[in-house]
Amino acid sequence: MNLNANDIVTFKLTTGEEIIARIKTIESDHYLIDQPISAVLGPQGLQLMPSLFSAKMEQTVRLNTGSWIMVAETREDIRNSYIQATTGIAPVTKQIITG
């Protein structure tokens, strides 16, 4: 998997937490990520919540490469929820129009 700036990905941290974020820049020992959100399993299923409660949501955050054990492309439905949570814009999903 090739990671690029502006990709929305899911990181599995060494602590077991999952963070969804948009990659800003990739360095050899760290990534700069925008608006990290944690994926948490709750009574209603998967929920998204801020990863840093006391930080400004719109700031860029440093994530050391030693802090995560896996990274993957975020599922489309979760990606759309992330975009809506961070921008307030609900992405349009592809639909087949029938007559």
Describe every region a protein language model picked out:
Residues 2-99:
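Conserved RNA-binding domains used in RNP assembly and mRNA/RNA metabolism
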